[in-house]
Amino acid sequence: MKFVSLLTFLLIPGCCLAITCDELQSPTQVRVFLERSKDSNPILRRNVSTTLEISPCEKEACNSKNRKEQQKEVLHLLRLDDNSRVHFLKGSRSSQCLIQRGERLLGCAACSELANEACRSYPDSSITRLQGTNIDSRDFSLLESESNTYSCDELEKNPGFFKLEIGISGAEYDQVIAFFDETREIPVTLNFFTDGILRKVYRTFPKYYLQIDKQWISTVLRVRSTRGNEKAFVAETLVYIQRDGNKYNLYLDPKNDPRLKNMSPSNLFITN
C-alpha cells in the first residue's frame, strides 16, 4: 500500500512538487523555467480569456481616495498563441479595442463581442506595451535573452522561495532580481535595475493566487515605475481579474468563456 501511494505521488503531474535552484543550474534550464512561469500571469499567457480591471495612475493621483473608480478601466483580454485582443468594456476607451496579430498592432474605434470596426495600424514600437499603463511584455522577454547571466540562491530565512539574479546587456535594464514561489512557480517580485537604481517592480500577492487545472495564476498584479525605491514610485498600475461572486472570469481554454459562446475565438482577430 505504501508503494502504491508513493507511485501515485510520483505520477500525478505537479503533485506537491517544487522547483529549487538545483533544477536551475544552466542558462537553458533557467530560460525554460522563466518561459513556463509566464503562464501564471493572465496578461502573458499564450491562451486565455479573462475580464480584467486595470487602474493606472501617475504621481499624486495614485494617492487619491477615489483613485480606483476614477482611473479604472474594465477590459476583456483574449490571447490565442501570438494573437491578442483587448476590448475595453468600461472607462475612457469603452467600445475600443487593440488587436495584435503576430507583429502587427491595430487599434479599432468600434468593437463589440462579435466584431471589430474602424481599425488602423499602430507603430511597431507600441506593440509590447499595454497602452495607458506601464506594463510592457518586452520586460519579460529581456529575462530570457541568450546573452543573460543567471545565478540562483535559496532563501534560508524564507523557505519555499528562491532568488534569481539576472544580468542583462544592451537593454534599458541591466539587472533583474526576482523572487519566486517554489511550489507555485510564480514570481512574487521582479525588480528591474539600471546602473544599480531600481526602475520598475512587478509584484504579485500570494494571498490572491488561484489554482485552475493544476496551474497557479496570480489574480492581482501591481506594477510600479520607480526612482530607486518601490515606495517612491512615479507611476503605478493595478490589475485585478474580475469576479462574479466567488467565480473569477478567467478561462485557460478560451472556448469555455461564456462571453465567447456565440463566436469562435479566432474570428475576433478579424478587422474590417
Residue ranges and their predicted role:
Residues 19-113, 148, 154, 239:
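N-terminal mature ectodomain segment of secretory-pathway/periplasmic proteins
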Residues 58-64, 92-99, 109-120, 171-175, ...:
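Short, surface-exposed beta-strand/loop "edge" segments at domain boundaries and coil↔beta transitions
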